[in-house]
C-alpha cells in the first residue's frame, strides 16, 4: 500500500459530559483516489469518524493523519478536506454561482480564476447554465450537485459526505449514486461516504467499513463483505440471509439440519460449532425429492424483480427464498444450493482473527496445491 491519505491510529472518542464512549480504538488507512464508505446504523460511530476527520470533533485519544501529517490540533479551515452535509448547507440568498464560488472568495482568489474554476466545477456536476439560478428554484438533486461542486472547487485531498442522499426520493437517489461514483472516478479524489443504507454502500464503494457500537466490525470490498460476512451482525445488516447453527465436521464438510454438506471453507477445528449463511438468491427451487432440503411454503410477496418466499423446514427453521418462479402457499418444495453458496461463520471471531485465519488457510491451500503439482510433474517425467 502507498502512503495513506488518511490514517486513524488507536483513535477513541468519549463525550466528557456524560461519559458515553462513541469510538473504541479505531485503526484504519485510506488510499488516495478511492471511494470509501462508513456503513452502520444510527449511533454506530460512523458520523463521529467523519467529524473527526473534518475537525468538527476532537479525538479523546489516538492520532489522526492527513497525507502523513498529524492533524489532531489543526483547525477546521486549515485541513485540506471538504464536507457535504445531509442538509447541503447552501446559502438561500445566493445564486448557484455565488454558492460555488464562496470558498474561493474567502481565499481571495482572483476574479478570473474564480469564474474559470466555478465553470469547470459546474460542468463536472452537469449544472452548466445554472449559474444565475437561485437556490430556492432548484430540485433536491440539483441542490446536491451545487453542494458537491462547492466541495470540489478548492480541489481538496478528501471529500467527506455525510448521508447526502438520504433526503432524496428512491429514483433520484439511485441516479445520484451513479453520478457520485462517476464523479469520484473522474476527479481521482478520495471520497469518504457515510450511510446507513447497505445498498448504497454496496453499489458505490471500493471499500466498506461496517460499524457497530463504536467499532469497525468488518472491512473489505463490497463483494468480500457480502459473500463472506464475519458474523451474525454483518450477515443480517448487509442484505438478507438465512442463518442456521451448524458444526464444521472438517475442512470442506459442514453439518446443519441433521445433514452433512460439502462446503468450500476450512481452517477451523474439527467439530467446531459455527453458523452457516445462505443468501435467499442462492437457493434454487426444485421438486421435493430433488432438493437437498424440503420446506413448506408459508407466504410470498411479489417484489417486482422476484418473489420473496417464506418457508419452514421440518425442524421449524425459517427460510427466505428469492425466486423468479411463483410458489403455492402450503406446498412442499425442494431447495438446492452449491458448496459455494454455503458461507461459514465462526462464533465471536474478531476481524483480525478472521483475516489471519483466511490468510493462513489460503497459504496452506497454495502450499498443498504446489506439492500436488510437483508430484504430478515428477510422475510425468518418470513416465516419459
Swiss-Prot record:
Localized where?
Cell membrane
Q: Which UniProt keywords apply?
A: ATP-binding, Cell membrane, Membrane, Nucleotide-binding, Translocase, Transport
Enzyme Commission code:
7.6.2.11
**InterPro entries named among the record's database cross-references:** AAA+_ATPase, ABC_SmlMolc_Importer, ABC_transporter-like_ATP-bd, ABC_transporter-like_CS, Mo/tungstate-bd_C_term_dom, P-loop_NTPase, Transp-assoc_OB_typ2
Q: Which PROSITE patterns match?
A: ABC_TRANSPORTER_1 (PS00211), ABC_TRANSPORTER_2 (PS50893), POTA (PS51305)
Q: What class of enzyme is it?
A: translocase
Protein name, as recorded: Spermidine/putrescine import ATP-binding protein PotA
Amino acid at each position: 500500500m502507498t502512503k495513506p491519505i488518511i490514517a486513524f491510529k488507536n483513535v477513541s472518542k468519549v463525550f466528557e459530559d456524560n461519559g458515553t464512549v462513541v469510538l473504541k480504538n479505531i485503526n484504519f488507512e485510506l488510499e488516495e483516489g478511492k471511494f470509501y464508505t462508513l456503513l452502520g446504523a444510527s449511533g454506530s460511530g460512523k458520523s463521529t469518524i467523519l467529524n473527526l476527520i473534518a475537525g468538527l470533533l476532537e479525538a479523546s485519544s489516538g492520532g489522526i493523519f492527513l497525507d502523513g501529517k498529524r492533524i489532531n490540533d489543526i483547525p477546521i479551515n486549515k485541513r485540506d478536506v471538504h464536507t457535504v452535509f445531509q442538509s447541503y448547507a447552501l446559502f438561500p440568498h445566493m445564486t448557484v454561482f455565488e454558492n460555488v464560488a464562496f470558498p474561493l472568495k474567502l481565499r481571495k482568489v482572483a476574479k478570473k480564476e474564480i469564474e474559470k474554476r466555478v465553470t469547470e466545477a459546474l460542468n463536472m456536476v452537469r449544472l452548466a447554465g445554472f449559474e444565475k439560478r437561485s437556490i430556492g428554484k432548484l430540485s433536491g438533486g440539483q441542490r446536491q450537485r451545487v453542494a458537491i461542486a462547492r466541495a470540489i472547487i478548492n480541489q481538496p485531498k478528501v471529500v467527506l459526505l455525510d448521508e447526502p442522499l438520504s433526503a432524496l426520493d428512491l429514483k433520484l437517489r439511485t441516479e445520484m449514486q451513479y453520478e457520485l461514483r462517476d464523479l469520484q472516478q473522474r476527479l481521482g479524489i478520495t471520497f469518504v461516504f457515510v450511510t446507513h443504507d447497505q445498498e448504497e454502500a454496496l453499489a458505490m464503494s471500493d471499500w466498506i467499513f461496517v460499524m457497530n457500537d463504536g467499532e469497525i466490525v468488518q472491512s473489505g470490498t463490497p463483494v468480500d463483505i457480502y459473500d463472506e460476512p464475519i458474523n451474525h451482525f454483518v450477515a443480517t445488516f448487509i442484505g438478507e440471509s438465512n442463518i442456521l447453527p451448524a458444526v464444521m465436521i472438517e475442512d470442506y464438510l459442514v453439518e446443519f439440519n441433521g445433514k452433512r454438506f460439502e462446503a468450500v471453507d476450512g481452517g477451523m477445528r474439527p467439530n467446531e460449532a459455527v453458523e452457516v449463511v445462505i443468501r435467499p438468491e442462492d437457493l434454487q427451487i426444485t421438486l421435493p425429492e430433488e432438493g437437498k432440503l424440503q420446506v413448506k411454503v408459508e407466504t410470498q410477496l411479489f417484489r417486482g424483480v422476484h418473489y420473496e418466499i417464506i418457508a419452514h423446514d421440518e425442524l421449524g427453521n425459517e427460510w427466505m427464498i428469492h425466486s423468479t418462479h411463483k410458489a403455492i402457499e402450503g406446498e412442499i418444495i425442494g431447495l438446492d444450493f452449491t458448496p459455494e453458496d454455503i458461507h461459514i461463520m465462526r462464533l465471536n471471531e474478531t476481524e483480525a482473527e478472521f483475516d489471519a485465519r483466511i490468510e493462513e488457510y489460503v497459504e496452506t491451500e497454495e502450499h498443498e496445491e504446489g506439492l500436488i503439482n510437483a508430484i504430478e510433474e515428477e510422475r510425468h517425467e518418470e513416465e516419459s
